[in-house]
Amino acid sequence: MIKKIVLSLITVLSFCSLALAQNKQVTGTVTDEKGEPIIGATVVAEGTSAGTTTGGDGQFTLTVPANATLSISFIGYETQKVSVAGKTHIDVTLGEEATGIEDVVVIGYGTGKKIGSVIGSVDQVKSEKIENRPSTNVVDALQGQVAGLQIMTGNGELTSTSSIRIHGLGSMGADTSPLILLDGAPIQASTLQTINQNDIASVNVLKDASATSIYGSRAANGVIYVQTKTGRRNQESVDVTLTGQYSMSSAVSPELNMMSANEMLDYIGAAVAVRLSGDALTTPDKIASGRQYFIRNFGLAKFMDENYNPMNDYKWWNEILERNAPMYQVDLSVSGGSAKTSYYFSGNYANKTGILPGSELDRYNFRTNIDTRANNWLRLGLNLGLGYQHSSVADTNESQGSLYVSNPVMASLITPPYQPLYDDNGQMLNFFDATQAINPLMTADYMPRWQNRITMNGMAFIELTPVKGLTIRSSLAVDAFDWRSHGASSPETPTPSGKFGTGSASELFQRFYEWTWTNTAEYKHTWNEVHNFTALLGEETLYRNNNSFSVASTGITSSRFLNIAMGTEVSGGLPTYSIAQSASNSVFGRLEYNFAERYFISGLLRNDASSRFGENNRNALFWAVGGMWNIKNETFLRDNQTISDLSLKVSYGTQGNSGIGDYNHRQYMAAGSAYGGYTTWMVSGIGNPDLMWESQNTLTVGANIELWRKLSLSIEYYRRQTNDMLMSIPLAPSGGYSGRAGNVGGMRNSGIDLSLNYDIYASKDWFVNFHATFNYNKNQLTDLWEPGLEFVYMGNGLQAYSVGDPFPTWTMQEWRGVDPETGLDTWTTADGGITSNFNQAALVNLGTSLYAPYTGGFGVTAAWKGLSLTADFSWVHGNYALNNTMYFVANADMGLSSQFNQCDLAWDYWQQEGDQARYPRLDQAINFDSRMLEKASFLRLKYIQLAYTLPSHIMEKTKFIKGLKVWVGGRNLWTVTGYNGLDPEAAEKGVDVDTYPNTREFTFGLEFKF
């Protein structure tokens, strides 16, 4: 019995020894991507109950099976799984969760913060609102997405740029564009609008002084911070994404309702009859008589048959503009990472044909983002973007013969429909007899225009963490481009008398580069777990160089060699060369404190020195303070299930603006024409050594609330006062100079931003969201350059500086309508009366502005399983534009003297007493007055997309493709407006005439993930 017991004990002990031999002790350290230890991370051996948490130094010790797999996790970080087979010690780096990164913003040189902990006014647009849009202009995708950010794409030209404004127009003469940062490096707005949209991870818009003052003078009009995509450390596999899309473009708006050939002849016949008879009433017999007179006496018989009926009836809009222009785009990106290094590489090619004849764009983009942590105290990185762009440009500024008739846009409207396109042999005509101009379809053949642009932008940085909480960083950023523009006119260009005989060519070169060297030290410390401090100190140096060269020649005799070397003489005077250089140096600092994530305060100082001002005024000190109360984190609200977020914030600060020419503080000379074999020199500008910084003071008060974790509302009030505005002060003409740079006047922008986001429904398979933005901005001049001066005409006869009104305010002869008794146009006189004599009409301040006081957008997103629908709208309200096109297409004078076709609005003319008409009797000239000033408000379906992502279990069967997404979409598909021009958005430039139309796109795309 005893023997059996002993043997049994030996057997049990043997099994226990074997079991113990299969377990082992593993130690390790868990850190974040900066090498900081993560305290409290959970370490678990999968499939067992063995687990522990990391201590104060991020270290752990755990006994686990010999071949166990450890799962390491921590809130806000991606879970890592590591096999311990053959290992007794492991070091693990946890990267932030991808979903969390989207809610992190980088403000003012420091490390990222959660949006909810930012005092300043900041809005974020995520990548899904930007990528895969059928446009080569990435900025266009931001329209309507951020309250207070106004994006206007004024035309559809392939290389055009959008205007960008944050909280209105901040100055009369200085730069009004926001600072653009790409991964922290400053770039030109033109560079931003050419980068690959699929490289963008997020766009952060900084709007108030607390968020922007740290950037100094360049951020006087706000900041747009663009973050590009990166790889992730410890990524198990390489992610490869291949995207391709095909789009078709057409003009965004249908043509104006232009007259047919018979309608045009009847209309002009009516005008002829009225002018011959003096009787404004037009009857069918009088119209027929006037029509025949017009045909016989204006050389139109060759376009008519024996019965004086037109042999052709072309809709020139359809011939010139109504075409589907294709766009092809392909994008390839590769991302991944090891324990120490993350990387992202991408390449993009886009080819887009314009809707105007002769316009085409080829663009190549390449990007490299590399980030490596050499050890726990050293981090290195490089972000680099390269681009090449070639575009053939449709010249919309060319005029020949009658005004605008060679401009393809205007020609599509005004070319008479009876003008044939082909000769008797079926060959396309190269010259139109009716308009005495080149066939607009062939303008690009005779007058080629093209542009090349090479861009480079990037930043290299080194980051040190010598002690816990201290980050020292040095970065060097570069933004550069080379631009070349070529234009020519062939000696074969047809004219009324034959051909030009000699051609011409011109070349323009521009080279721009800017480098920025930034050095910062940031220290973060938490004391007693509730007192959180952050201190930042920095220094920054910027240098900018911009030079250009242009030359033109004439006398080219061969259409085969249209370049400047083939000319016999230089045209337009001597070749021109210019170089502009500027530099600035800044020092700055910021202190931030929050108590238990409830009470936040911050303060910052920045001193800027700029070479654009004289020695006595080069330095300027700017500052900002801000505070926030996160009420949700109070004990009385922390557990409230209804209110999931509630905070109040306020900030006040000063900023400066140096966005003027580089040498306005100096008197300088320029080369003039040659005289006696020598180049002459002349004083080119009057310098102002007392020129100083334009200053701004900005107050912002805001509140954020979120209910049930699904409905959020943000509201902010702002007031931005600009003083000592930089502008050219008008001088007496007798002095020989039109103006001199100075600091004068004041301007105020005040308004409200509203942002709403509502997750209407969310379940396992369904998701429905609605979002909206709204901005009201009141812009007004507060004073001008002389005490008591309240109103000054701007010199263009259209606009004025007016204290108390928006800048600029429209100021024209005020049209008072057509007199029902006489059929004559009437206008306001200086004493407020009415006159039918245009020479007695006064210039009147109409109190309306070019810029809209109300802007916004809204959209919906709905998803069911793998199917999703997105629709985004944008709108503006209250802006006015001069619809100059109406002067040419609703004007009997233009129809009669130049044979310009007319639109159907022209039929609304006065004939007899009592008529209420828009246009006067047909023997009266149309004048340039406020009748052409129209409200350019609009609502536009900016983008819509229907997409389907195939289920993952289907993709897994391929063993190769991880994901597949297919979509169809459209841009600018629907517009509601009362504007009578081609496109209300084109009215952004103020005077709308011959503008390359905006485009609408239909697109189809595929995205593969490998």
Language-model features, listed with the residues they occupy:
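Residues on the lipid-exposed face of transmembrane beta-strands in outer-membrane beta-barrel proteins
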Residues: 228, 332-336, 366-372, 458-464, ...
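Conserved C-terminal beta-signal and adjacent last beta-strands/turns
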Residues: 8, 333, 769, 849-877, ...
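Short, small/polar-rich motifs associated with maturation and membrane association
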Residues: 1-367, 379-381, 385-387, 457, ...
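Transmembrane beta-strand segments that form the barrel wall of outer-membrane beta-barrel proteins
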Residues: 347-353, 601-610, 759
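Surface-exposed loop/interface segments of Gram-negative outer-membrane beta-barrel transport/assembly proteins
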Residues: 100, 116-118, 233-313, 354-361, ...
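Extended, hydrophobic alpha-helical segments in both membrane/secreted and soluble proteins
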Residues: 200, 366-368, 474, 517, ...
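Residue-level recognition of beta-strand termini and adjacent short loop/turns
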Residues: 47, 66, 86, 375, ...
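Solvent-exposed loop/turn segments connecting transmembrane beta-strands
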Residues: 355-357, 611-617
